[in-house]
Regions:
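N-terminal alpha/beta PP-like core and its mobile active-site loop of ThDP/TPP-dependent enzymes
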Residues: 1-180
């Protein structure tokens, strides 16, 4: 545990993904996804792959999931980056391939006001996903909730009808970890 509830929540989530058997995360980095990106980079139990082009990243993750038979995490920053994942998400839906899509987002108070890299990411993938959740803005530690949410993401993506799930993570600034 650190003194930073955002990074503690991300660590609880990522560690639970690893304990549930997730072995790969494909990251299309951006500033808004910094907390999750750094957390994945620090874990030894999930191999991280960085792909700058979101569409290529999504199809790379799809290939990893198809070849391994296990869910693969796909992480991007806010805005149109999430939209670039749609073709691969659709393919994952129809091929029943487990993907766990994590999209970073602006907090609710910055949406609808013209803030940069802000689009409506709520259910952006429509009927292509098995489960959607908007993660609450993290203001205090709640490791149990993040562990349960990670477990649900894995189970929802690997259930009777495997396929993609989507969690939208709103982050407030500062996005870097607290020092000290």
């Amino acid at each position: 545990m650190t003194e930073d509830p955002v990074y503690d929540a991300c660590a609880a989530f990522v560690n639970e993904l690893a304990s549930q058997g997730v072995g790969h995360a494909v990251i299309s980095p951006g500033s808004r996804s910094t907390p999750l990106t750094l957390t994945f980079a620090e874990t030894q139990d999930i191999k991280t792959w960085v792909r700058l082009d979101e569409r290529s990243a999504a199809f790379f993750a799809l290939g990893l999931a198809k070849s391994s038979g296990s869910p693969v995490v796909l992480l991007c920053t806010s805005g149109s980056a999430a939209a670039n994942y749609l073709p691969a998400v659709s393919e994952a839906n129809w091929s029943e391939t487990p993907l766990i899509i994590l999209t970073a987002n602006r907090p609710p108070e910055l949406r609808g006001w013209g803030a940069g890299q802000t689009i409506d990411q709520t259910n952006i993938y429509g009927s292509n996903i098995r489960w959607f959740a908007e993660v609450p803005v993290i203001t205090e530690p709640n490791s149990n909730w993040f562990q349960r949410t990670a477990a649900r993401a894995v189970h929802s993506s690997t259930g009777l009808r495997p396929g993609p799930v989507h969690l939208d993570w709103p982050f407030r600034e500062p996005l870097e970890p607290k020092l000290g």
